[in-house]
Amino acid sequence: MEETLKKQKFSVYNIIFIIVVIAQLIFLSVSFAVNNTAHHEDEYFSYGLANSQNRVYLYGSAFQVPDNYNVWMTGDDFKYYIETNEESRFSYDTVWKNQAADTHPPLYYAVLHTICSFFPNQFSWWWAFGINLFCFAVTQVFLYKFFSRFARSQ
């Protein structure tokens, strides 16, 4: 009986500990995202690879597309590259086509395209960050479970 109570207390303390640690990590991650003043090209490419209908890379990049060198590109060109619109919503064939020309697996980009498809002609850095934050929290839970089992087996 006492052993069962100890296990229940231990598991309650574990759950509280997990919640506190994940809350702290999420707070730190969100505060970093809020205070971020610039974005790296990979963040732009994530949206482009998830949503672009015309080309994988806006400025050629690895494939050196010659049709956009020394040519003025408007803000609308860039907007069309990173956003979905009514015609391109839930168009996963282009996500797979774009990823065939890239080196990363398509799951992240398919999820990002799905989120962007719910908000056509809109853009937010928080959509990609939300995916990363969710995966981060899930990873923390699984790491905790893994190491707690590993520690018990020792």
Say what each PLM segment does.
Residues 1-38, 148-149:
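Start-transfer (signal-anchor) and selected internal transmembrane alpha helices
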Residues 27-45, 62-68:
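Helix-to-loop transition at the C-terminal end of transmembrane segments
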Residues 30, 112, 116, 144-152:
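Membrane-water interface at transmembrane helix exits
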Residues 51-104, 118-119:
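Interfacial juxtamembrane loops and adjacent helix segments
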Residues 100, 104, 112-115, 124-134:
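Membrane-embedded glycan-lipid processing machinery
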Residues 106, 121-126, 150-154:
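Membrane-helix interface segments
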Residues 126-151:
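Transmembrane-helix motifs of polytopic, lipid-linked glycan transferases
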